[in-house]
């Protein structure tokens, strides 16, 4: 029941300030879901729960494939604080009542549902005031791009500067260089939103007011172009605030 779903989404909350729900209309079927998670959140293995349901008719193998793809593109690109635990679970249940569906359409709908829930978790991260998307392009491989993006996303220094709305790209460059990914400073380009602020690891002239407006928003987009290959990755994260410390300085 609709009311039962809302009650369940409410019941699984821990330090979440709001319940997290989604419904995606597919081609003749629906994928719906709920999740909880606000900290100790860097899947794999973190304190997050997500339950998805669909009325699509699909064999277990197809459901597993759709969920694996969806999780890889959503929850596994999320890092609130780089911390993990032993409690993460993502489940997908299918009733089959709507009949058979196109496999690609099912994967797309499951992925969209997972991504929405992951974005809701980032927005509700403990103490967070901003959602931050760290995009890395031009890496030697997707794996190295993920390594580099995750290093920036998990940096306490970078997170503090985002909270302070300070576009200090030097911290980003430092984390990229220490990440283990191949980084050639002479090729590195860093942008906030659509504004290039560093080229070849050297500051470039730009409209500071445009960057300031971007930093003041609720969503910050950062792109790090490494220029050494075709690999790319995006990590979804957030800023680090005093409220996060207040929440976690004791046992919760």
Language-model region placement:
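Alpha/propeptide regions of enzymes that mature by internal proteolysis
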Residues: 1-252
């Amino acid at each position: 029941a609709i009311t039962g779903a809302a009650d369940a989404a409410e019941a699984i909350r821990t330090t979440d300030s709001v319940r997290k729900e989604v419904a995606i209309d597919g081609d003749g079927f629906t994928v719906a879901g709920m999740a909880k998670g606000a900290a100790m959140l860097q899947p794999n293995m973190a304190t997050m729960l997500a339950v998805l349901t669909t009325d699509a008719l699909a064999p277990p193998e197809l459901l597993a494939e759709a969920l694996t793809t969806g999780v890889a593109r959503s929850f596994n690109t999320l890092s609130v604080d780089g911390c993990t635990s032993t409690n993460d679970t993502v489940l997908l249940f299918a009733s089959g009542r709507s009949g058979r569906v196109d496999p690609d359409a099912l994967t797309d709908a499951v992925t969209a549902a997972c991504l929405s829930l992951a974005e809701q978790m980032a927005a509700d991260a403990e103490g967070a005031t901003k959602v931050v998307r760290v995009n890395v392009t031009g890496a030697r491989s997707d794996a190295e791009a993920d390594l580099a993006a995750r290093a920036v996303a998990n940096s306490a220094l970078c997170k503090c500067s985002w909270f302070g709305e300070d576009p200090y790209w030097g911290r980003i460059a430092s984390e990229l260089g220490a990440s283990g990914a191949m980084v050639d400073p002479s090729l590195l380009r860093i942008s906030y939103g659509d504004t290039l602020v560093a080229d070849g690891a050297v500051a470039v002239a730009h409209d500071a007011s445009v960057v300031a407006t971007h930093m003041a928003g609720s969503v910050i987009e950062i792109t790090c172009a490494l220029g050494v290959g075709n690999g790319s990755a995006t990590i979804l994260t957030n800023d680090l605030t005093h409220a996060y410390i207040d929440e976690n300085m004791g046992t919760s």
